[in-house]
């Protein structure tokens, strides 16, 4: 396990003591000692899967599944146009359609070395920046994707 995950585990333990079992942990077996924390972020009537990826690199990132149902190939050009606009307007995130499953994802990359890593920054970013942003744009994305 990596140093960032050790710090995140302490935060998760504190959250669990308070009754918040937001995250489950998955340890990977790779050269970067990757640990993925699975959670959910509520946006309107949707509970969006969230993956916080901590590894032995200069970055940490959060991936949010904007859709959990594959979008139709026919709407992908319109969706990509909408996502490109969002990518230009909101610099903190990157939206894309995965070629693996045709779902829409949002990645938020955070530079942070082991020594400076603060897990509360990750959680606060999700709750205070990403969640309000998704409240503003999620319905429009689903509409363009033909899922609303």
Model-predicted segments: where are they?
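Short, internal acidic amphipathic alpha-helical interface segments
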Residues: 62-103
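Charge-rich, low-complexity N-terminal segments
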Residues: 1-51
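A short acidic/glycine-rich loop-to-helix N-cap element
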Residues: 112-128
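Short, aliphatic-rich beta-strand segments
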Residues: 104-108
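Short, ordered beta-strand-loop transition motifs
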Residues: 25-33, 56, 97-101
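Short, highly charged C-terminal tails/helix-capping segments
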Residues: 141-148
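Amphipathic, Lys/Arg-enriched alpha-helical patches that create a basic surface
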Residues: 128-137
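Long, continuous compositionally biased terminal/linker segments
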Residues: 39-69
């Amino acid at each position: 396990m990596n140093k960032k995950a050790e710090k995140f585990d302490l935060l998760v333990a504190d959250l669990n003591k308070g009754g918040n079992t937001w995250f489950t942990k998955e340890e990977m077996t790779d050269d970067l000692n990757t640990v993925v924390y699975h959670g959910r972020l509520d946006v309107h009537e949707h509970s969006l899967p969230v993956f916080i990826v901590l590894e032995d690199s200069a970055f940490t990132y959060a991936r949010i599944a904007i859709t959990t149902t594959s979008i139709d190939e026919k709407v992908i050009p319109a969706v990509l146009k909408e996502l490109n606009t969002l990518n230009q307007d909101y610099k903190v995130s990157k939206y894309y359609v995965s070629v693996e499953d045709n779902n829409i994802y949002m990645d938020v990359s955070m530079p942070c070395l082991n020594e400076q890593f603060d897990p509360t920054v990750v959680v606060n970013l999700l709750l205070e920046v990403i969640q309000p942003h998704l409240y503003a744009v999620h319905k429009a994305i689903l509409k363009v994707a033909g899922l609303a």
